[in-house]
Amino acid sequence: MSRRLLAADVRHLPPGEVIPAGTEVIDGVPTAALTVLAALRGSIEVGVWQMTAGGVRDVEGDEVFLVLDGHATVRFDDGETVELRPGALVRLCAGEQTEWRVHETLRKLYVST
């Protein structure tokens, strides 16, 4: 790509570096992958993350993401549940404890600090 065009189509990037799916797997054998597209001033990172079907618990960092593909449900430690489908725009806050149930491989474009 170029310094300006980071990906021609982020929906179809091959999976990136394999990373832990969460801090604790609670269902199935999910795998996660991450492709960092840009590191911006300070600690701001832009990338694509995906996870296969299964369930995990995690502790979040500050992040905003847009779901590109797939289907999942995220339950937050305050009891709120968010259904994730393509087009959903979600904010995560540092320190939040979450439970992810991925029903169909989930792919998201994220911006995090």
Predicted segments with their positions:
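Ligand-binding loop in jelly-roll beta-barrel domains
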Residues: 81, 88, 94-113
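Short, conserved beta-strand element in jelly-roll/cupin
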Residues: 51, 59-74
